[in-house]
Amino acid sequence: MVTIETRADQMVLNLGPHHPSTHGVLRLIVTLDGENVVDCRPVLGYLHRGMEKIGENRTIIQYLPYCSRWDYAAAMMNEAPVVNAPEAMAGVKVPRRASYIRVIMLELSRIANHLLWVGPFLLDMGAQSPFFYILRERELILDLFEAATGLRMVGNNYFRVGGVTVDLPYGWVDKAHDLCDVIPGKIDEYERLITNNPIFRRRIENLGYISREDAINWGLSGPMLRASGVKWDLRKVDHYEIYDELDWDIAWDTGGDCLARYIVRIKEMRESVKIIRQALDQLPGGPYEQLEARRLAEGPKSEWNSFDYQFIGKKSSPTFKIPTGEYYARSEEAKGELGIYVVGRDDTTPWRWKIRTPDFANLAILPMILQGTKVADLVVVLGSIDIIMGSVDR
């Protein structure tokens, strides 16, 4: 009698570090049993540039251009905690107009990030059309960034200790209002095309499940945490900038799978549009052209020249010293909690500069949620986390 022997050896597969589906220079050492993933070990560091050590050898002004090289999909969001930490340590006050401008820029960056997530996420599953649609809308946001800061994607260098670099230019507020009229309709278009598509839903429902307890225990943040049923948003928790003065809701879901993470990001884009609309309407002094007209009409002693109507309180000098002490500043970035831990020594440079990026923490759970999935689903689960390797490796 002839017997057929089958080999049951496990196979080790190297994915990356330059595979397009890894969204950067990420290497995954995947152990497979047939088509099932048994183990996955991320290998990091291919894009490590020593951002923390650079921060310890630069003044705040010198270091700000480096920040946009962390998460370059939402570059301006990296600047917020970098200036918030010295402001809190030195007791620097920020004018209300500057705070409103910051919030507008942060929420525009959030929408730009989520648009750039939706397109490649669908592309990982073989759907090419949405990728071209999101570039169309993202272009409108990048045009606004270019008008206000001079640059589109990275190196905006717009936030400053005490405010922002320059005021919003002539006609910018009207263009931002036009954008807020366009984006909701485009999100509706995405939802008609994607959300209830039966092929899309069968592909990602119940895939990459993370329970509420696991999300908390692994220290997840952002859409990864809120998609597992945890209503935690630093904009509500920490009450920073002027978010408390605006009416908006936390985007969350209880599914815990890849579909829930997609739904949360779609909801977040809608909430960001609500925030931007209100911030534009309530902007102290109104559009730049109206504010300047009031100042000219009422003279140098006009109330429109008071502190709250400035784009920066007091320009920090190149020799601005970080006071002795330590502080942890954090903000709700598009991917989660971005934190900066600073130890000052009454010097122009910090003694310790620690960066806590959200996608580095969120990536840690990948090996756990991949166990038992098919190898074909690996890139989909990875894509649902939303990582940028410049931010992960720093």
From Swiss-Prot:
Xref: InterPro entries: NADH_Q_OxRdtase_suD (IPR001135), NADH_UbQ_OxRdtase_49kDa_CS (IPR014029), NDH1_su_D/H (IPR022885), NiFe-Hase_large (IPR029014)
E.C. no: 7.1.1.-
Coarse class of the protein's main subcellular location: membrane
UniProtKB keywords: Cell inner membrane, Cell membrane, Membrane, NAD, NADP, Plastoquinone, Quinone, Translocase, Transport
Any single Gene Ontology cellular-component annotation: plasma membrane
GO biological process: photosynthesis, light reaction
A single MF term (Gene Ontology): NAD binding
PROSITE patterns: COMPLEX1_49K
Subcellular localization, as worded in the UniProt entry: Cell inner membrane
Reaction catalysis annotation: a plastoquinone + NADH + (n+1) H(+)(in) = a plastoquinol + NAD(+) + n H(+)(out); a plastoquinone + NADPH + (n+1) H(+)(in) = a plastoquinol + NADP(+) + n H(+)(out)
Membrane topology: Peripheral membrane protein
Quaternary data: NDH-1 can be composed of about 15 different subunits; different subcomplexes with different compositions have been identified which probably have different functions.
Protein family membership: Belongs to the complex I 49 kDa subunit family.
Described purpose of this protein according to its UniProt entry: NDH-1 shuttles electrons from an unknown electron donor, via FMN and iron-sulfur (Fe-S) centers, to quinones in the respiratory and/or the photosynthetic chain. The immediate electron acceptor for the enzyme in this species is believed to be plastoquinone. Couples the redox reaction to proton translocation, and thus conserves the redox energy in a proton gradient. Cyanobacterial NDH-1 also plays a role in inorganic carbon-concentration.
NCBIfam families: NuoD (TIGR01962), PRK06075.1 (NF004739), PRK07415.1 (NF005649)
Protein name listed in UniProt: NAD(P)H-quinone oxidoreductase subunit H 2
Species, as recorded: Gloeobacter violaceus (strain ATCC 29082 / PCC 7421)
Lineage: Bacteria, Bacillati, Cyanobacteriota, Cyanophyceae, Gloeobacterales
Gene transcribed to yield this protein: ndhH2
